[in-house]
């Protein structure tokens, strides 16, 4: 799923340029743009359109890390 792939890349909390996201996820640039704009609209990521960069919103990042941790504990 493109959204999950992009969120996994953004989990480091740093700013990423769409071109970098496209290269690392092998997703088409139009899909990266569509997904990042959707995520920004609902405040899952911060989108700096002037600088053309995106990063995950800290509360979203904490939530995703907690979910992953719970999933890992369940699988143990």
Regions found by a protein language model. Give the residues of each.
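Short, cationic-aromatic polyanion-contact patches
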Residues: 1-3, 17, 49-73
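Short helix-capping/hinge SLiMs at alpha-helix to coil transitions
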Residues: 10-13
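Short loop/turn and capping residues at structural boundaries
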Residues: 21, 33, 50-51
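Short amphipathic alpha-helical interaction segments
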Residues: 27-41
């Amino acid at each position: 799923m493109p959204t999950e792939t992009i969120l996994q890349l953004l989990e480091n909390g740093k700013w990423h340029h769409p071109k970098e996201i496209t290269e690392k996820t092998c997703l088409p640039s139009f899909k990266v743009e569509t997904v990042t704009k959707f995520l920004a609209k609902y405040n899952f990521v911060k989108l700096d359109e002037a600088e053309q960069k995106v990063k995950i919103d800290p509360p979203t990042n904490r939530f995703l890390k907690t979910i992953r941790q719970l999933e890992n504990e369940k699988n143990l």
